[in-house]
């Protein structure tokens, strides 16, 4: 094991360094007597440990900063009042202050250092060193990142360093021009991240995802917020993009296929690869019967977050009194059907965009042209039904660039261009799959959606007769094996087709209005014609 010298980072007086602890050591450290506050880990009936993260039960997007310097000023997709995103600029002197604050917090203490990889491809992976003072934070990154072999650990040289000072606060934040006492800051040039005053584990996971989203596309590698799977031979790769609630995890966890990963992937000349070594699943309302894979993954070495646990260790997955964003992290080998030994597979043949359309307009499946692929990828659309005060349910649209706007560091058109380049090279086809509602007022059944996914993966959809849907110019199949053909043209699900037309016009206008922000460069302007035409 490499000798870890923290003095080169300005961290001095360390009383003990626990370097890449075993799961046994982590369990002992996070459940031992004498821990206080959010350091405490509680053993549960399933063997997994549960921890609480305080007021931050999710990411803190208003407190995310990137240092603006010569390297980043012209490459990062900066937050602007006109087109807001999470990339707030930070001055170099403010960075020096917050980094110093984090280092001071970590001095003169027992520390945990976890060296791990982000990225399953050895050529482009990032070697990351996490320096934390809390045992369960070391456990979290041990679960979520790819663990080095003994030999790799011996010669480990980090490309990137993360300082987690969750116990510190930026007390003079107003003077520094920051949003609050909490700060999650990145320096792209020095390759460092600082976390202050938030205990949420996901800041470390999504922090590294954001950084992969910066470095990889600049090397010509597609970086994607998606799940991915392959057939039982580890071939016929499929990628599933989709925002929360669209079925990304459900549809990629398929008993007939092998999981590559559930959230973050790259696509280079060798194929598709996972960034992670674990999964971070939502567990609110988790049911053993409907999601057995996730339920069975919650055992010793898994780490629950913000779940309600009784004194006797009994878990209440229904309780959302702390947060709806209750989570579990576990190493990917807790899932049986996975691609082994490395979470990677050949170039994708099928790319699926999942949208849950609450407007009832989009077809259950559309075969996209390359231009439509870029347009709908940039749009990143889904919609949910939100109750209004009179009990009427109104659809609320969400447009999130590339189905992952919160984690994009470059202009969204860069991600779209890289994805299409890779698709053209592998001959991949893209599909827009609506897992939402239609004119019946009911959600499209999971049986029909699975039938559609099966037809895409088998290639049957390419042999099906098709027709065009007006306004959107979508090509849709008129029949597919195992799918109710009465739903394939959404107009057929309305008693009166003019009702679909009115809703379609409304949704088309929303797409067009949202897309204006991408027309600030030539790549974006060229795609307007691929969107809805009124």
UniProtKB/Swiss-Prot annotation:
<keyword id="KW-0464">Manganese</keyword>
<feature type="binding site">
    <location>
        <position position="327"/>
    </location>
    <ligand>
        <name>ATP</name>
    </ligand>
</feature>
<keyword id="KW-0479">Metal-binding</keyword>
<feature type="binding site">
    <location>
        <position position="449"/>
    </location>
    <ligand>
        <name>ATP</name>
    </ligand>
</feature>
<dbReference type="InterPro" id="IPR001272">
    <property type="entry name" value="PEP_carboxykinase_ATP"/>
</dbReference>
<comment type="similarity">
    <text>Belongs to the phosphoenolpyruvate carboxykinase (ATP) family.</text>
</comment>
<dbReference type="GO" id="GO:0005829">
    <property type="term" value="C:cytosol"/>
</dbReference>
<dbReference type="GO" id="GO:0006094">
    <property type="term" value="P:gluconeogenesis"/>
</dbReference>
<comment type="function">
    <text>Involved in the gluconeogenesis. Catalyzes the conversion of oxaloacetate (OAA) to phosphoenolpyruvate (PEP) through direct phosphoryl transfer between the nucleoside triphosphate and OAA.</text>
</comment>
<feature type="binding site">
    <location>
        <position position="200"/>
    </location>
    <ligand>
        <name>substrate</name>
    </ligand>
</feature>
<protein>
    <recommendedName>
        <fullName>Phosphoenolpyruvate carboxykinase (ATP)</fullName>
        <ecNumber>4.1.1.49</ecNumber>
    </recommendedName>
</protein>
<feature type="binding site">
    <location>
        <position position="59"/>
    </location>
    <ligand>
        <name>substrate</name>
    </ligand>
</feature>
<feature type="binding site">
    <location>
        <begin position="443"/>
        <end position="444"/>
    </location>
    <ligand>
        <name>ATP</name>
    </ligand>
</feature>
<feature type="binding site">
    <location>
        <position position="263"/>
    </location>
    <ligand>
        <name>Mn(2+)</name>
    </ligand>
</feature>
<keyword id="KW-0067">ATP-binding</keyword>
<dbReference type="GO" id="GO:0004612">
    <property type="term" value="F:phosphoenolpyruvate carboxykinase (ATP) activity"/>
</dbReference>
<dbReference type="InterPro" id="IPR015994">
    <property type="entry name" value="PEPCK_ATP_CS"/>
</dbReference>
<dbReference type="GO" id="GO:0005524">
    <property type="term" value="F:ATP binding"/>
</dbReference>
<feature type="binding site">
    <location>
        <position position="225"/>
    </location>
    <ligand>
        <name>ATP</name>
    </ligand>
</feature>
<dbReference type="GO" id="GO:0046872">
    <property type="term" value="F:metal ion binding"/>
</dbReference>
<feature type="binding site">
    <location>
        <position position="291"/>
    </location>
    <ligand>
        <name>ATP</name>
    </ligand>
</feature>
<feature type="binding site">
    <location>
        <position position="225"/>
    </location>
    <ligand>
        <name>Mn(2+)</name>
    </ligand>
</feature>
<keyword id="KW-0210">Decarboxylase</keyword>
<feature type="binding site">
    <location>
        <position position="327"/>
    </location>
    <ligand>
        <name>substrate</name>
    </ligand>
</feature>
<dbReference type="InterPro" id="IPR013035">
    <property type="entry name" value="PEP_carboxykinase_C"/>
</dbReference>
<dbReference type="InterPro" id="IPR008210">
    <property type="entry name" value="PEP_carboxykinase_N"/>
</dbReference>
<feature type="binding site">
    <location>
        <position position="206"/>
    </location>
    <ligand>
        <name>ATP</name>
    </ligand>
</feature>
<keyword id="KW-0456">Lyase</keyword>
<dbReference type="Pfam" id="PF01293">
    <property type="entry name" value="PEPCK_ATP"/>
</dbReference>
<feature type="binding site">
    <location>
        <begin position="242"/>
        <end position="250"/>
    </location>
    <ligand>
        <name>ATP</name>
    </ligand>
</feature>
<keyword id="KW-0963">Cytoplasm</keyword>
<comment type="pathway">
    <text>Carbohydrate biosynthesis; gluconeogenesis.</text>
</comment>
<keyword id="KW-0547">Nucleotide-binding</keyword>
<feature type="binding site">
    <location>
        <position position="206"/>
    </location>
    <ligand>
        <name>substrate</name>
    </ligand>
</feature>
<keyword id="KW-0312">Gluconeogenesis</keyword>
<feature type="binding site">
    <location>
        <position position="206"/>
    </location>
    <ligand>
        <name>Mn(2+)</name>
    </ligand>
</feature>
